[in-house]
Amino acid sequence: MKKAKLIFKDNTPFSLDFDDFYFNSKDGLNESKFVYTHSFEWKNQENFIIAESGFGIGLNFFLTLKRFLQTTPSKRPKKLFYISVEAFYIEKEQLREIYQKLGFYEEFKELLEQFLKFYPKAKEGIYRFYFEDCFLDLVFEDIAVLKELDFKADIWYLDGFSPNKNSQMFDGNLIFEVARLSKKNTQICTFSSASFLQKNLKKYGFRVEKTKGFRKREMIKAYLENELEFKDKEAYFSRTFSSLKNKKVAIIGAGISSAVLAYELSLRGFKIDVFEKHLELGKGASGNESGILSSLILKPKVNLGEFSELSFIEASRFYRQILDLKFKGVVEFAHNDLMQERFDTQRENVLFKISKNQAFLEEGGVIFPKNLVKNLFEKSKACIYFNHEFQAYKFENECFTLKFKNDIVKSDYAVLIYAMGADTKDFVFYDEMKLSKVRGQVTHLKPFLNTPFPLSSKAYICPVKDDLQVIGASYDRLDTSLESKEEDDKQNIENIAEFIDKNTKLEIIGSKVGFRSYSSDRFMIVGNAYDEVFYKEEYKALLWTKNKEQKLAKMSCNLYFNFAHGSRGFSTSVLAARYLCALINNEPLCLEKKYIHAIHPARFLIRKLKKGL
């Protein structure tokens, strides 16, 4: 990612990349208020979305958030979503220094320090920050990334240096995407009154009004007169906006994917009931004593690898923001030539500090799954029903009625979510969706190696906790036994041989078996259940029509999937939960389209139809 080149000129940040000031050198604070943050009225609605081209030093955001928090709750939206795109990265310490030099630091100190505490490294991606009743999605990408995003803004801040210095931020391609991501009466706020900007706004349906700008300057405001009719060549992956009869949600399964989802839903005011077939938490794969938060290391530009990296860093940031966890890092070792080749291609990646055959992932570390899942459920205030083995559902009058073993019935749920991990295989019956159930066994040893962070190679070693050290894990697609096996313990020990002296005597004090859920392409399966009959009929000619506009997809009901997280569910569950909340609650989707397509439940069927099969 490009780093911003800036200096101070006239006591104001000045961009060497664009030969322009970040904002008015005379009175930038009041100009930002006049042009952007105080130029519209709040609406008393569920979600209010502000989108911005050019985050800069974040001044517009902090002014907006401060105004939002100072407004009486009954006179503002329930939730503020703020999406800002920035192509030029400013270092954390430099941002703090800028606010101090400008004399803004004390005014924004509390919000700024909360932001800087979880500020990511200089790497492209969408990074979420949690504030009171507000989500900030900071998008570190070129502005062209807008074509990958999906939301309908109430307000747009078109910022980003003078148009004659940065024309890309105001050209026709950008304004088309701005219009696509807007709804009727969306307001455009901008300091510019450039004629070509006005022309582009009018071209895509905005009513443009000239108005007095800050001090003697002239500026414009624009309003979208009618929402664009936008047809998509990949409409089979598009969202369908949901309508809910109530805010009751049922989640089947009580593992990590369910726990993160329950917490995220609770932030939006949903009442969550969780149904678990076991008698307590921690009986499945999410119940190990210790585990590792880490990332796959694949070659650059590999979709699965990039998604794993984003999932990893966002999970790390989530656990630090929400649970105040502290991570000391994790060391990954290249244990064969293929792994070493991957390491060699990732030496410039800021997530991986690679030296020879080792990669240190600073944001990773040891996790304690049982405690983590328990804490998230407690924060969510979800009601967990143990000893409830799900059997079937009935959907009528826009609500679900659930049937459990022993003739137990629960009803009146607007949303049903499958998050039962490996057991999902018994409840999803799409022909093209191939799921596998993989057995894994971890071994509990008496402490034998003093390490502050996990070590991962053929197998992994966790730091000592409660006089116990966890190693693992085995991998078996064919074995379905719940019983621990001596040969698996032996294999786990053999796989950590590189970390211990051959004369070291290891004492096994226990084992635990769990089952992982995998898809055939290793991506998780997350999204709305789809209408298979509709898909097979409507998209049957995709072999010949895949480059033409498609009819919008049809979903079956408010049934959602959240499974096939494999062995990295503690990473992927965070993005899964945010994405599902966005679908259920009609929020901005927090993922780029390339990732949405990769995790969509219908992807296997679409691939088949594109081949004419």
UniProtKB/Swiss-Prot annotation:
Its EC number is 2.1.1.61, 1.5.-.-. Residues 252-613 are annotated as: FAD-dependent cmnm(5)s(2)U34 oxidoreductase. The keyword Translocase does not apply. Keywords: Cytoplasm, FAD, Flavoprotein, Methyltransferase, Multifunctional enzyme, Oxidoreductase, S-adenosyl-L-methionine, Transferase, tRNA processing. It comes from the Bacteria. It catalyses: 5-aminomethyl-2-thiouridine(34) in tRNA + S-adenosyl-L-methionine = 5-methylaminomethyl-2-thiouridine(34) in tRNA + S-adenosyl-L-homocysteine + H(+). GO terms for molecular function: oxidoreductase activity, acting on the CH-NH group of donors; tRNA (5-methylaminomethyl-2-thiouridylate)(34)-methyltransferase activity. It holds the Pfam family DAO. Its main location: cytoplasm. Gene3D superfamilies: D-Amino Acid Oxidase, subunit A, domain 2 (3.30.9.10), FAD/NAD(P)-binding domain (3.50.50.60), Vaccinia Virus protein VP39 (3.40.50.150). Residues 1-225 are annotated as: tRNA (mnm(5)s(2)U34)-methyltransferase. In the N-terminal section; belongs to the methyltransferase superfamily. tRNA (mnm(5)s(2)U34)-methyltransferase family. In the C-terminal section; belongs to the DAO family. Catalyzes the last two steps in the biosynthesis of 5-methylaminomethyl-2-thiouridine (mnm(5)s(2)U) at the wobble position (U34) in tRNA. Catalyzes the FAD-dependent demodification of cmnm(5)s(2)U34 to nm(5)s(2)U34, followed by the transfer of a methyl group from S-adenosyl-L-methionine to nm(5)s(2)U34, to form mnm(5)s(2)U34. This is tRNA 5-methylaminomethyl-2-thiouridine biosynthesis bifunctional protein MnmC. It comes from Campylobacter jejuni subsp. jejuni serotype O:23/36 (strain 81-176). The gene is mnmC.
